[in-house]
């Protein structure tokens, strides 16, 4: 088994080396793709856009992103996947030959296990939701037309082009092996397809959100403690990252498994509180909710404020404080974009009507 994995890992190293040698001019492009594919953009950019255009799509997108990333964490703890940038330095596979030279980049040194790829899984799930939802909107109940078939082909070509670029980016940056990105894409699609058949997420109560959030958090912590009690160190990758990363400043605490867990449960809890709040009902369910200028204003203001909010980084000196603030920050994203911003804008748009009276 170990020899088979070594051969698979060697193929990945050779793939990374080939891309880095033959596509040096594409370095900036691959880094940009990796940054855009970060799941944070689903929360801070795609969610507010889709929520205010099609509320149901926005809700499904957030659920797929959160549950997909949570499953990714569990899979990583089970599969113990290596990462190219440390495996190539740590393995005995090249004891009789020269070690392939693999470059590292500021976005290379993630601290969690490598399989499956979180970037590939998150991008596949989120973009699958957007493509299938867009096709569903344009198709409606009518018989498919020639234009719809063309749109269908274009969207799926775009979808697979995005997945290919994300996969190549993660391989180029030595963050993942090829089999890990393929597993990520397939897993992301599976999660998104599952949520196409789940309708209860659109009218879930605050109690249900709380119970699901509690389950996700307690299961992950319980699973971690169980394996730790059995002598399995699930934080083994932190030592690998700190040891083999080219520059210490490239190792970020916000890429650790627990940081991912707190962000996910915080986002889902924030969505539950928001969708069951009076501010949401007064603004997003009020008379202005169907007025396009109002919805467009909500999108623009949300994107601007969330961009500024995202630039605020929790202090990372103390892990407990960092994780707590990460939870609060993630919960504030849906709270701001779904209830607070629309509520304030609704008050602004209502002012002229009140003055005319």
Curated annotation (Swiss-Prot):
Q: What residue ranges lie in the Cytoplasmic compartment?
A: 50-60, 139-147, 192-209, 276-291, 342-357
- Where does motif Prevents secretion from ER map? 354-357
Keyword Transferase applies:
no
> Record's Gene Ontology CC terms?
endoplasmic reticulum membrane; membrane
Pfam families referenced in this protein's UniProt entry, alphabetically: PAP2
Q: Which GO terms describe its molecular function?
A: glucose-6-phosphatase activity
For this protein, what reaction is catalysed? D-glucose 6-phosphate + H2O = D-glucose + phosphate
Residues forming the catalytic site: 119, 176
| Enzyme class of the recorded protein, top EC level | hydrolase
Q: Where in the cell is it found?
A: Endoplasmic reticulum membrane
| Recorded topology in the membrane | Multi-pass membrane protein
Q: Which pathway is this protein engaged in?
A: Carbohydrate biosynthesis; gluconeogenesis
Q: Which residues cross the membrane?
A: 29-49, 61-81, 118-138, 148-168, 171-191, 210-230, 255-275, 292-312, 321-341
Chief location bin: endoplasmic reticulum
Q: What's a single GO BP term from this record?
A: glucose 6-phosphate metabolic process
Q: What Gene3D superfamilies does the record tag this protein with? A: Phosphatidic acid phosphatase type 2/haloperoxidase
What keywords are assigned to this protein? Answer: Disease variant, Endoplasmic reticulum, Gluconeogenesis, Glycoprotein, Hydrolase, Membrane, Transmembrane, Transmembrane helix
Sites where the protein binds substrate: 83, 170
Q: Which residues are glycosylated?
A: 96
Q: What does this protein do?
A: Hydrolyzes glucose-6-phosphate to glucose in the endoplasmic reticulum. Forms with the glucose-6-phosphate transporter (SLC37A4/G6PT) the complex responsible for glucose production in the terminal step of glycogenolysis and gluconeogenesis. Hence, it is the key enzyme in homeostatic regulation of blood glucose levels.
Q: Give the UniProt family note.
A: Belongs to the glucose-6-phosphatase family.
Task: Please give the clinical condition linked to this protein.
Answer: Defects in G6PC1 are the cause of glycogen storage disease Ia (GSD-Ia); also known as von Gierke disease. GSD-Ia is characterized by hypoglycemia and hepatomegaly.
The molecule here is called: Glucose-6-phosphatase catalytic subunit 1
